Amino acid sequence: AATWTCMNEQKNPKTNKYENKRLLYNQNNAESNAHHAPLSDGKTGSSYPHWFTNGYDGDGKILKGRTPIKWGNSDCDRPPKHSKNGDGKNDHYLLEFPTFPDGHQYNFDSKKPKEDPGPARVIYTYPNKVFCGIVAHTRENQGDLKLCSH
């Protein structure tokens, strides 16, 4: 199985400085995480899984100043159709769900405080759950999600 490598800056509590960490993810584990996640958009206690816009609006138009990630898979690269609540008859879009180096399943029904989702997300299609890739925040759990390498 493919190993995905994500770079993430994390603060060292001893020095209070950010350090670049290389995080490794097993694709089989990430696909299993997606497979076991509910097929819904933001309707769980934790709000995961939810729509990964990838720089698009719900009508499949690219938002100003955004560059969608190219996955190299036509199911994943197709501009989305996302109705207001994400369960329209012809909806198709990307979902994001937390994934971890140790492969454990995220507790999607954890309420406040929700389980820490960590920096990385498995991205897959709604409604068919086609695996697209793994993305991660570049600093802690904030900011844009970038495609990890594999």
Please identify what each model-predicted range represents.
Residues Y56-H150:
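Functional cores of ribonucleases/endoribonucleases
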Residues A2-G58:
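Short, surface-exposed binding/anchoring microloops in extracellular/periplasmic proteins
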